[in-house]
Regions:
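Structural signal for interior beta-strand "rungs" in well-ordered beta-sheet cores
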Residues: 1-105
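Long, leucine- and charge-enriched amphipathic alpha-helices
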Residues: 103-133
Length: 133
């Protein structure tokens, strides 16, 4: 459609049976892969080295940040933000912000990584106590 930009070395696969559609105003950065039968919504921005597997739908005004990957047959809701290097393995709700691999809601992802040092210390303490018994 109109006002679409596709950066260098990016690939938009042609569909065999359905349609691959990049809607009005979408921006596809360099080295992005859009597989067959995908739909990219109006105003979506796909950043460098992102990849979308076959038959997935990216909604309107979605940000798919660098090196993020979307598995096949998934739906990324309107206005969602997929952080860099995220591996999307399930549908993403409209307006959601996800990160990690596999993807988590950004709030859960932050809690998970904030607790990682504590978990490490708990494991060390457990091993110390186990060695004493």
């Amino acid at each position: 459609e109109d006002d679409v930009e596709i950066g260098p070395n990016s690939i938009v696969d042609r569909a065999a049976l359905g349609e691959t559609i990049v809607r009005k105003g979408a921006k596809i950065d360099a080295l992005v892969m859009v597989a067959h039968n995908c739909q990219i919504g109006e105003g979506a921005i796909l950043m460098a080295q992102a990849g979308i597997a076959g038959s997935s739908r990216v909604g309107r005004n979605v940000f798919l940040c660098g090196q993020a990957g979307v598995a096949d047959h998934l739906d990324i809701g309107d206005g969602a933000i997929v952080a860099a290097k995220t591996g999307v393995t399930g549908n993403v709700k409209p307006g959601a912000m996800v990160s990690g691999s596999p993807h988590l809601d950004i709030r859960d992802w932050r809690k998970f990584w904030a607790s990682a040092p504590q978990v490490y210390e708990l494991v060390k303490e457990f091993k110390r106590l186990k060695a004493r018994s």
